[in-house]
Amino acid sequence: GISACTNIGTTTELNMRDFFNSKGIKYEPVAFEKADEVVAAYDAGRCDTYTTDKSGLAAQRTKMKNPDEHIVLPETISKEPLGPVVRQGDSVWEDIVRWSLNTMIEAEEYGITSANADSMKTSDNPQIKRLVGAEGEMGAAFGLDNEWNLRIIKQVGNYGESYKRNIADTGILPDRGPNQLWTKGGIL
């Protein structure tokens, strides 16, 4: 069998067990409380493999002594979408954060980029005009002005632009996989 590092008491630990069992692979879990402990144990050779969310694997790989000696395998053993979180009790801030992400996703869906966002104010599509603040009062519900979405798009781009710049171009996760729009087979 193999030894496999993971975090104790997490869905990752359960997903690892289910995956290995479904493949008939004998393994010995080596579980730790903290992510840094898991990485240190794996990097020290205490485990043959290490599992967590793909984005976590990619990020933690950069902390290893010799990152180029390790690869993130292409297999996906579970799908657990990750997203922005906020503390409980501030529903307005929660809405702003949620709608900021939605803005980036919708902008990509409509072909709005950081480069063309201003020109979209004159679009024939009323949904696009609302998204860039040329129509409606979308920001009022959050206590924001009507161009808050436009500023998000101009400053960070649509979801695809942001993913490419911050994740794909860095080599962390070059393939968007489930981070594609639903129209391209993803979950967005």
Task: Please give the residue ranges for each predicted region.
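Bilobed "Venus flytrap"/periplasmic-binding protein-like clamshell domains
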Residues: 1-38, 55
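Alpha-to-beta junction loops
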Residues: 2, 43-52
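Short, well-ordered beta-strand segments
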Residues: 3-7, 50, 85
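Extended ligand-binding regions for polar small-molecule ligands
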Residues: 10, 56-57, 74-147, 158-160
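Sec-exported extracytoplasmic/periplasmic mature domains
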Residues: 17-22, 43-47, 62, 101-109
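Conserved beta-strand segments of alpha/beta enzyme cores
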Residues: 28, 69-71
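Pocket-flanking alpha-helical
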Residues: 39-41, 56-66
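C-terminal functional modules
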Residues: 134-188
